[in-house]
C-alpha cells in the first residue's frame, strides 16, 4: 500500500526505492530531507516505490501496481508523473505525453567545449553566485508564482551546500544560466540550462568555465 512517509519504516522504503538511480537517486532523497514538512511537497512510499508530489506533478522511483498507482494519483489530484518506464509501468489508463532524456557523465570526466563566438564571450561576465531571484526571473519571466517557489527552493538548498548555480551577464541582464540543483548521493543533478532567445545557437551555454 502507498502511504505518506511518516515513520522510519516508510522513510527506509522511500530511500531504498531511490538507491542507485540516476537523477531520482539524488533529487528525491534530498527533497525528502529538506522539504518533508513544507508545502507544496508531499512524499509517499510503497513496498518498492518512492513518490514525490509537488503541485499536480509526481516523480516516481521504483515501481508499483499500475492500478493502485493510477487510483492513488487520481485521489491526490495529479495530472502528470515522471518515471522510468523501463522500471515502472505507467499508471493504468495513462498515456505517455513526452520522453525526457537523462545524460550521465562519470566522475572525473569532462565534455569538450563546443565552438563559440569568442568576441561575444569576451563581452560576458561569469557570476558563480548569482542572486537566486535573478535566476528565477530569467527562468520564469512571466510567472511570479514559479519565481517565488524556485527562489525559496534554491535558497534552502544553497544554504546547505546542496545546489550550485552559475549565470552569465551581458551588462545588467542575465542571459544564460545552468545549475546543479541536487548535490547528493555522489551525484550532481544539472538542470534549468537556459540561454536568452536572441543568443541561442552561439555556443554560450557550453562555455561555462571557471
Predicted segments with their positions:
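Short amphipathic alpha-helix that is part of the acyltransferase structural core
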Residues: 1-27, 110-149
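A structural preference for long, well-packed, hydrophobic secondary-structure segments
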Residues: 2-3, 12, 192, 197, ...
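Short secondary-structure junctions
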Residues: 2-4, 39-42, 92-99, 122-126
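Conserved donor-binding loop and adjoining core beta-sheet/short helix segment
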Residues: 16-76, 175-191, 196-197
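A short, aromatic/hydrophobic, helix- or strand-capping loop or linear motif
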Residues: 24-32, 81-85, 145-155
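Acyl-donor-binding surface of acyltransferase catalytic domains
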Residues: 50-121
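Conserved acetyl-CoA pyrophosphate-binding loop and the N-cap/start of the following alpha-helix
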Residues: 68, 198-199, 203-210
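A mid-sequence, solvent-exposed acidic-amphipathic segment
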Residues: 133-189, 194
Amino acid at each position: 500500500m502507498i502511504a505518506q512517509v511518516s515513520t522510519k519504516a516508510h522513510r527506509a522504503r522511500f530511500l531504498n526505492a531511490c538507491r542507485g538511480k540516476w537523477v531520482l537517486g539524488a533529487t528525491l532523497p534530498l527533497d525528502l530531507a529538506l522539504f518533508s514538512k513544507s508545502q507544496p511537497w508531499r512524499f509517499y512510499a510503497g513496498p518498492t516505490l518512492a513518490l514525490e508530489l509537488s503541485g499536480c506533478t509526481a516523480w516516481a522511483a521504483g515501481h508499483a501496481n499500475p492500478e493502485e498507482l493510477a487510483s492513488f494519483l487520481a485521489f491526490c489530484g495529479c495530472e502528470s508523473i515522471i518515471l522510468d518506464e523501463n522500471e515502472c509501468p505507467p499508471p493504468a489508463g495513462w498515456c505517455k505525453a513526452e520522453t525526457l532524456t537523462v545524460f550521465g557523465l562519470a566522475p572525473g570526466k569532462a565534455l569538450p567545449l563546443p565552438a563559440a563566438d569568442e568576441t561575444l564571450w569576451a563581452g560576458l561576465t561569469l557570476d558563480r553566485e548569482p542572486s537566486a531571484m535573478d535566476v528565477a526571473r530569467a527562468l520564469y519571466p512571466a510567472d511570479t508564482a514559479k519565481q517565488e517557489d524556485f527562489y525559496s527552493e534554491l535558497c534552502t538548498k544553497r544554504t546547505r551546500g546542496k545546489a550550485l548555480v552559475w549565470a552569465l551577464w551581458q551588462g545588467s541582464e542575465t542571459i544564460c544560466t545552468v545549475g546543479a540543483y541536487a548535490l547528493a548521493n555522489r551525484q550532481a543533478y544539472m538542470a534549468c540550462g537556459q540561454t536568452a532567445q536572441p543568443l541561442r545557437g552561439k555556443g554560450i551555454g557550453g562555455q561555462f568555465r571557471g
